[in-house]
Curated annotation (Swiss-Prot):
This is Small ribosomal subunit protein uS3. One of its GO terms (biological process) is translation. GO terms for molecular function: mRNA binding; rRNA binding; structural constituent of ribosome. Residues 40-110 form the KH type-2 domain. It comes from Rickettsia canadensis (strain McKiel). GO terms for cellular component: cytosolic small ribosomal subunit. The gene is rpsC. Coiled coil: none annotated.
Length: 217
């Protein structure tokens, strides 16, 4: 049943490859802050879905400040003209968290073809545009190897091609050592809203093995 384990959650920890998406300390108000983090992520992802956001990291160094790091394929969509969009986002977060010190950092994802979240979103976008699911999956696989990926697995589930009966189809190329803890495996999901219903997309990308001199966040 090892394939059923989330590749991210399996590797989260200070001595492993993956770090936490939320960094905070709270004894009594953990639940409130956790819900705030979920709302902030939903706000960012829903407001800037065209930016193809990979990851939203939220840090709370103190009770009075919050630092939000956004990794995206198209950072200009989030920033907007003369920084208008990011100012609106900052005010919305200030209103939501009641904090005056809100810092937002935008980072561009350069190797987006080996970023599982962006690859999954790209495939979902193509499915919504009625591109063949097989073509979308094979294109993503080829692009990932060109940017240094060592293995990729892509899965699509739903009424593929408008079929009456839902099914799951997947392709795998290269290595995918899901049981190896030192393996750097990126995993993400996305949904394509089509006229036939929702199609789920899952992507696993193997980038190589973790070494003592190299840590992925």
């Amino acid at each position: 049943m090892g394939q059923k384990v989330c590749a991210h959650g399996f590797r989260v920890g200070p001595t492993l490859i993956k770090g936490w998406d939320s960094v905070l300390y709270a004894e009594k108000h953990y639940k409130t802050l956790f819900i705030q983090d979920l709302k902030i992520r939903d706000l960012i992802n829903n407001s800037f879905n065209q930016a193809q956001i990979s990851r939203v990291l939220i840090e709370r160094p103190s009770n009075k400040s919050i630092i939000i790091n956004i990794n995206a394929k198209k950072p200009n969509v989030i920033i907007g003209r003369s920084g208008n969009e990011i100012d609106k986002l900052k005010k919305a977060i200030e209103k939501m968290t009641y904090l005056q010190e809100v810092y937002i950092n935008i980072h561009e994802v350069r190797k987006f073809n080996i970023d599982a979240a962006i690859v999954a979103q790209t495939i979902a976008l193509q499915l919504e545009k009625r591109v063949s699911f097989r073509k979308a999956m094979k294109t993503a696989i080829q692009a990932s190897f060109k940017q240094g990926g060592q293995g990729i697995r892509v899965s699509c589930s739903g009424r593929l091609g408008g079929a009456e009966i839902a099914r799951t189809e997947w392709y795998i190329e290269g290595r995918m050592p899901l049981h190896t803890l030192r393996a750097d495996i990126d995993y993400s999901t996305a949904e394509a809203i089509t006229t036939y219903g929702v199609i789920g997309v899952k992507v696993w990308i193997y980038k190589g093995e973790y070494t003592a001199n190299k840590r992925y966040n």
